[in-house]
């Protein structure tokens, strides 16, 4: 495709290909002059909820099919599958030698990646960090697993209206694939090079419900705490917030707390 050489793409799971695509778009949009930057001070924090599940499926299938005749594994099996390989591939692409790792926290993965990037930059550990996440889990294991959890909508005849997280008739989500990426940069560093600045991160918060494997706390304790933590970190008051971007998976049990 337009972002990855076909030969190189064969060494990558689809989730990594998405990561490379969005990272290239973000770096280009940021205007970072990679050749004239201190590459030791540019990092990559890029997450995936599960990583190369398609690759795992393919290799497990090949093993089951050929095990009687002496199974053979693709030498790229592990490098394609692991969830931190996308961050590694992005750093290799640009020669970034700063902090490099993956986050993995289910649906909060990319948000955690951005939060970590913010914290490392304000600690002086990096001037800029390429941050985001990607996923490519539309595979038998991905679809079958979520279906077994009753997490997917059964409105197969009207997929365009099936995802309805704030409706009493919600019955699950629709799976998708793709990636998203931002370039976070220390403010003065960005100003000095005349960067196009979309927004400023004022603060971040993190928390846990400590309640259930998949269901959110019925009183929204984790959600309340994380917003309080973020406001405190940003030194802001609730009335200063104009917009709350809530996370709605459209499952029946998980999101009654969003209206509390």
Predicted features and spans:
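Active-site nucleophile and cofactor-binding loops and adjacent substrate-binding regions
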Residues: 11-16, 39, 76-84, 101-109
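Hydrophobic alpha-helical hairpins/lids featuring a short glycine-rich hinge
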Residues: 25, 30, 34-73
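Conserved small/polar residues in nucleotide/adenosyl-binding loops
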Residues: 256-260
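Acyl-CoA/ACP chain-elongation machinery
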Residues: 125-171, 204-218, 248-253
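Active-site-proximal alpha-helical scaffold in enzymes
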Residues: 19-33, 86, 91-94, 99-135, ...
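Glycine/charged-rich beta-loop-alpha catalytic/anionic-binding loops adjacent to active sites
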Residues: 2-8, 64-76, 93-103, 160-168, ...
């Amino acid at each position: 495709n337009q972002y990855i050489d076909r030969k190189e793409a064969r060494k990558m799971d689809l989730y990594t290909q998405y990561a490379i695509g969005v990272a290239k778009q973000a770096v280009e949009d940021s205007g970072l002059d990679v050749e004239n930057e201190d590459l030791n001070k540019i990092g990559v924090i890029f997450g995936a909820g599960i990583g190369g599940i398609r690759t795992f499926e393919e290799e497990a299938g090949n093993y089951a099919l050929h095990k009687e005749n002496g199974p053979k594994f693709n030498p790229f099996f592990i490098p394609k599958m692991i969830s931190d390989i996308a961050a590694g591939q992005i750093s290799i692409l640009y020669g970034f030698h700063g902090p490099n790792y993956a986050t993995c926290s289910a649906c909060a993965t990319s948000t955690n990646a951005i939060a970590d990037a913010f914290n490392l930059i304000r600690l002086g550990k990096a001037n800029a960090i390429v941050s985001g996440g990607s996923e490519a889990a539309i595979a038998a294991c991905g679809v079958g697993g979520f279906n077994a959890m009753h997490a997917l909508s059964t409105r197969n005849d009207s997929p365009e209206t099936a995802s309805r997280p704030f409706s009493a008739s919600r019955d699950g989500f629709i799976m998708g694939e793709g990636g998203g990426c931002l370039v976070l940069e220390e403010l003065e560093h960005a100003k000095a090079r005349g960067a196009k600045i979309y927004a400023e991160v004022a603060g971040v918060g993190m928390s846990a419900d400590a309640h259930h494997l998949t269901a959110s706390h019925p009183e929204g304790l984790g959600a309340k705490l994380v917003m309080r933590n973020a406001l405190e970190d940003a030194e802001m008051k609730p009335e200063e917030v104009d917009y709350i971007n809530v996370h709605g998976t459209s499952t029946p049990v998980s999101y009654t707390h969003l209206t509390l």
